[in-house]
Amino acid sequence: MPNCYNNMTEFYLASYLQFASSGYHYTGTCALGKVVDPNTGLVYGFENLYVTDASVVPKTPRGNTQATTYVVSGKLSEKIF
């Protein structure tokens, strides 16, 4: 990192900004409401397209999204089948 040789605080900040990532646990990208029926997971305007993953969760959970996704998928699959 140029210009950071004598200032470690600047170096760590620049490193963080350059290499930090979200971990790819996206949620809420298709939040229940206007696009998806909250009771069935059915996408409005389609006959057979369901969303049952973390994209329908309106707020990001504190932990890993895996358990939340299992619950959402399980509950909505019971309603679908």
Curated annotation (Swiss-Prot):
Superkingdom field: Viruses
GO molecular function, one term: oxidoreductase activity, acting on CH-OH group of donors
Pfam families for the chain: GMC_oxred_C (PF05199)
Family: Belongs to the GMC oxidoreductase family.
PANTHER family assigned to the protein according to its UniProt record, in alphabetical order: CHOLINE DEHYDROGENASE, MITOCHONDRIAL (PTHR11552:SF147), GLUCOSE-METHANOL-CHOLINE GMC OXIDOREDUCTASE (PTHR11552)
UniProt name for this protein: Putative truncated GMC-type inactive oxidoreductase R833
